Amino acid sequence: MKIDILTLFPDMFAPLEHSIVGKAKDKGILEINYHNFRDNAEKARHVDDEPYGGGQGMLLRAQPIFDTFDKLNVTKPRVILLDPAGRTFNQAYAEELAQEEELVFICGHYEGYDERIKTLVTDEISLGDFVLTGGELAAMTIVDATVRLIPEVLGKEASHKDDSFSSGLLEFPQYTRPAEFRGMKVPDVLLSGHHVNIRRWRMEQSLRKTWERRPDLLENYDFTDEERQILEEIKSEGK
């Protein structure tokens, strides 16, 4: 995968050079480039200006973004604009983006964008119903969530399939050694070696956590008969 990020603050992306994204680069699975679009700004390197018609704040001008984009070595990329008004990012969206060969991120700043910038864009993405100072933190989040889903990045494909949301449910609790720590014990079933019971316990815990914390995720979930039965048992506990 090739990723190009248009930003006023390339240094903010230094953390991406570590951990999973850094390993993907080292393996040659990922190429990631940062482009400061101020370098392509006309008018004394000004990247923003006042909005026509008046209003608060400054808008990013179209010219620096377009000229920077024109210099990218891309063929048919998904072009992502980070915008609070965009489609909300989630695990399914990350899985969709992980199938792409080229991604371009446009990170805004100031009050907003000249609307004409959006003619370059295929996706407008938001992390949620809140506003950040710029698009850089959102871009880093999306890159990290997406890159870890690329085959061979994590080493084992199953490494992410049990993540919360990958299955459509929240992840079950997990434990490691010691079996007892400060009076807190690992559930006996996990120490039993009985794989059928362990699988059912994990299923029950995952369904329970989802029901208690994110019941909205269950609305479109494709239940097995066993899962449906377990969920009904969980619901009946509160009656």
UniProtKB/Swiss-Prot annotation:
<dbReference type="Pfam" id="PF01746">
    <property type="entry name" value="tRNA_m1G_MT"/>
</dbReference>
<dbReference type="GO" id="GO:0052906">
    <property type="term" value="F:tRNA (guanine(37)-N1)-methyltransferase activity"/>
</dbReference>
<dbReference type="InterPro" id="IPR029026">
    <property type="entry name" value="tRNA_m1G_MTases_N"/>
</dbReference>
<dbReference type="InterPro" id="IPR023148">
    <property type="entry name" value="tRNA_m1G_MeTrfase_C_sf"/>
</dbReference>
<keyword id="KW-0489">Methyltransferase</keyword>
<dbReference type="GO" id="GO:0002939">
    <property type="term" value="P:tRNA N1-guanine methylation"/>
</dbReference>
<feature type="binding site">
    <location>
        <position position="108"/>
    </location>
    <ligand>
        <name>S-adenosyl-L-methionine</name>
    </ligand>
</feature>
<comment type="function">
    <text>Specifically methylates guanosine-37 in various tRNAs.</text>
</comment>
<keyword id="KW-0949">S-adenosyl-L-methionine</keyword>
<protein>
    <recommendedName>
        <fullName>tRNA (guanine-N(1)-)-methyltransferase</fullName>
        <ecNumber>2.1.1.228</ecNumber>
    </recommendedName>
</protein>
<dbReference type="GO" id="GO:0005829">
    <property type="term" value="C:cytosol"/>
</dbReference>
<comment type="subunit">
    <text>Homodimer.</text>
</comment>
<keyword id="KW-0963">Cytoplasm</keyword>
<comment type="similarity">
    <text>Belongs to the RNA methyltransferase TrmD family.</text>
</comment>
<keyword id="KW-0819">tRNA processing</keyword>
<dbReference type="InterPro" id="IPR029028">
    <property type="entry name" value="Alpha/beta_knot_MTases"/>
</dbReference>
<dbReference type="InterPro" id="IPR016009">
    <property type="entry name" value="tRNA_MeTrfase_TRMD/TRM10"/>
</dbReference>
<dbReference type="InterPro" id="IPR002649">
    <property type="entry name" value="tRNA_m1G_MeTrfase_TrmD"/>
</dbReference>
<feature type="binding site">
    <location>
        <begin position="127"/>
        <end position="132"/>
    </location>
    <ligand>
        <name>S-adenosyl-L-methionine</name>
    </ligand>
</feature>
<keyword id="KW-0808">Transferase</keyword>
